[in-house]
Amino acid sequence: MSNQTNKAQDNQVEEIVEGELLNENATEATDEASLMDELTQANFRVEELEKALQEAEAKVDAQKDSVIRAAAEVDNIRRRSAMDVEKAHKFALEKFINELLPVLDNMERALQGTDAEAEATKAIYEGVELTAKSFMSTVEKFGLVQVDPQGDTFNPELHQAIGMQPSADFPANTVMMVMQKGYTLNERLLRPAMVMVSQG
């Protein structure tokens, strides 16, 4: 009996050991499957995070581009505004000076129509001449320049031809006579000079 009991006990021990081994193998298999599952989930999460990172980087790049464009636009607006202010300062007097041009023309006509040598009109001539010179020097300080092209080559940007006449004294396309002087304000034409041009 002791042999049988020993065998029975050995069988029981073997069954217990086999059961434990099976349990260990099953646990190891379960642990391995669990680890594989966790690894798969971790890989999936890494892929999700990488995708989210790429999207975030794309958004950052788009924002950087927007910031660069906005900065360039601000610089352009600043430059345009500065140019507009400069032009406004430069040409603010344009309308006012245009109103003064007939006064200058009338003084020129008064000088042309008055005899500078006659005793009766000499004082008037000198007074008008001094007034015209003073007036012209004052407006020149603000950028007004007189265009008096007598003897110059005809320039359609500064002169307006009233007519053409044949002339032996002047080469072709030369201003023979100035009917009315022109004016520029800060290098911008206010009024062209009215001229007679030679045909040659």
UniProtKB/Swiss-Prot annotation:
PROSITE patterns: GRPE. GO terms for cellular component: cytosol. One of its GO terms (biological process) is protein folding. The keyword Translocase does not apply. Residues 1-11 have a biased composition (Polar residues). InterPro entries: GrpE, GrpE_coiled_coil, GrpE_head. Participates actively in the response to hyperosmotic and heat shock by preventing the aggregation of stress-denatured proteins, in association with DnaK and GrpE. It is the nucleotide exchange factor for DnaK and may function as a thermosensor. Unfolded proteins bind initially to DnaJ; upon interaction with the DnaJ-bound protein, DnaK hydrolyzes its bound ATP, resulting in the formation of a stable complex. GrpE releases ADP from DnaK; ATP binding to DnaK triggers the release of the substrate protein, thus completing the reaction cycle. Belongs to the GrpE family. PANTHER family: GRPE PROTEIN (PTHR21237), GRPE PROTEIN HOMOLOG, MITOCHONDRIAL (PTHR21237:SF23). This is Protein GrpE. It comes from Shewanella pealeana (strain ATCC 700345 / ANG-SQ1).
